[in-house]
């Protein structure tokens, strides 16, 4: 970024709930406040009451960083509604997302802001993620996504086009599409589809700028009848609004349902092979 030009101010939006691990939240917040391009404000949504240990982490960072603003929801509402509320408290048009257990690399905000400043036609920019599963931080895989809008639009008809915790977006474009809403398990994908239908443009930087924590429950959560029901409902909605045609609907549901029904040990490989390829 040109040192002679003052970058646009921006917010970071993050949500946390009672089941988060306090040490993971602390690592996430540390990575936010130690960026090459630090945020002008961080909006942390407490999605329902937190544990005493999580409260202690939040209080420690609040004392150290006056730019940290806390939004407390009296009851857990789920990620979509928590982010919807949090976005209304973001004062700047550029907003970076962050999850409460991931780690942003120091150059992430700088790289994404540079892209948005030099490409005013882009509404959402993201990047790849390096995935890790334990405290050693050893990378076990990289989640790569297509780069430009022309590739991401068709890609979005069968795969989520963005790594949600990596994105930086223009708040006005998100609000034009109706902002976040409750769509269990698919809050971000749902928003991207609505934005695409509004004409928003997307881009992925072709580098990993975030460490994505793979929880031990990742693949167990992505199976079972409840997940299948949510998956089918989301795919049917994409068909209803015209984002996918009937053949794509059948193909998407068939592949995803088969993978969700696999035993947990096999589901990991089905997920990586079918649902993670570019």
Language model regions located:
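Conserved donor NDP-sugar-binding/catalytic core segment of glycosyltransferases
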Residues: 107-139
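Short aromatic/hydrophobic "clamp" motif used to bind/position activated sugar donors
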Residues: 95
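Short, well-formed alpha-helical segments that are part of the catalytic scaffolds
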Residues: 19-34
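Catalytic beta-strand/loop signature of glycosyltransferases that borders the donor
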Residues: 128, 202-209
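A conserved acidic beta->alpha catalytic loop
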Residues: 46-56, 75, 99
